[in-house]
Structure formats: C-alpha cells, structure tokens
C-alpha cells in the first residue's frame, strides 16, 4: 500500500464486513429500539442489536447505521426517515471521493461563503492533458459569472476567424494587380525635350570647350555672363516643364 499512497490524501480503510442494504422495516425496528433505550445518545449498538433480533445483521452494521442516524438527526427533533438518511449518506460519500486529475476536469470552489462574482477568482482547476479547456470556454465562464451583457466572444478572435480574414485580404489585394496588367500607359514629352533626347541618344551631339586663363576684366565679365546664363537656364527649364504632356491610355478590358 505504501507505493500507492499519495501525500496529502487521507486513506479510507473499508471494513471487511460485507455491506448490507437497509430496508424500511429494518430501519423502523432500529428506530423503535433506539427509542426504547432512551434515545440516540443512550442507546448502544449491542443493546440495539439485541432488541432488533434480525438475522444477518452484525454489530458493525448497527454501529455504522447508528452513526449515520445521529449525524442525520442532530439538526432535527424528529426521527429521520430511511430516505433522508440514505440521501445524507450519499452526499457525505460523494464529498470524500477522490477525483483523478488525469481522467476528469472539474471546477471545485474552495470557499462556499464567497460571493458568486468572486468564485471564479478562487476556482481551482484540475484538468487532465487530454481535456484541456479552450480559450472560448474560459472567457465564457468569466463573462457569465460577472453578468456581462456583451457576448462572451465579442472581442475574441479565434484562429479560424483570423485565417479567414487574412485570406480575404490577400484575395482583395491580388485582384487589382491582375487588372493592372491590362493597363497601357503612354508618356509623351514635348518637342524641346524630344530634340534634346534624340541628339543624346544617337551620339551626334558633341561639346567642345576651350579653356584659357582669364584676365581681371575678363573674370568680371565672365561672372556677369554666368549670372545671366543661370537666369536664362532657369527660365528655359520652366518653359520645358510647362511643355510636358502626359497621355494616359487605359484599355477597355481593364475598365470592364
């Protein structure tokens, strides 16, 4: 037994005497014997067994039945019936049952006097690996205990919903890319730019410069010429910019 004992678990030693099913008649005889002996506090199992005189009933059966009878009638002045005594016994046995944490998943409250809104905070979750609760169940339990009016999953996005949204966005982005393949764009530039580009493209334009050491007067004239040349170049650039024409041709298949 030492290998199967668990720390913190109270061992329950069952009696070797076989169980016996109490009938209404046997319980009535038991109650009459208890009353004849002066009540439940004065009656002893041995005297009760002698007064009952029922075959197949041992003193161990009388002891256990008397203990349950005392616990059931402690809060009542009237004799307890067999039905109430049986239900009370079942409740006591169910409280002592050990629930295997590997096979079942239960929520057991540690304090019964706490408010209903705070029970979930002090709830002890004992769950096996094969029955792990989902995030939806945890949020549903949390919302229901606090009486929220909003749906429990109003702000929760599951994995399936996130996957669906991502696929929809990918489809929406891919459609414009497919449609743009049928779009034809034509850029036409003014005559001044065409002439300049054509001369550079065929390599026919050449630039020859002769550099000489300028004198003082020539340097002054050269700086003035550079100033007027820069102003003229800026004005010419503005004129070229205004001469830029952009023609956009879109095929009819893309518009449809």
From Swiss-Prot:
Tissue spec: Highly expressed in the pulvinus and stem nodes. Expressed in the plumule of germinating seeds, coleoptile, leaves, internodes, leave sheaths, spikes and roots.
Record SUPFAM superfamilies: Homeodomain-like
DNA-binding region: 45-70
Highest taxon listed in the record's lineage: Eukaryota
Domain (HTH myb-type) ranges: 14-74
Pfam families linked: Myb_DNA-binding
Regulation: induction: Induced by cadmium in roots.
Disulfide bonds: none
Null allele phenotype: Increased sensitivity to cadmium stress and increased accumulation of hydrogen peroxide in leaves upon cadmium treatment.
Localisation per UniProt entry: Nucleus
An annotated GO cellular component: nucleus
Major subcellular location class: nucleus
A GO molecular-function descriptor: DNA binding
Function: Probable transcription factor involved in the regulation of plant height by elongating internode cell length. Involved in the positive regulation of grain yield. May be involved in the regulation of genes related to cell elongation and cell wall synthesis, which are associated with plant height and yield phenotypes. Plays a role in tolerance to cadmium stress.
Family matches, as PANTHER family: MYB FAMILY TRANSCRIPTION FACTOR MPH1, MYB FAMILY TRANSCRIPTION FACTOR PHL7-LIKE
Protein name listed in UniProt: Myb family transcription factor MPH1
Organism name: Oryza sativa subsp. japonica
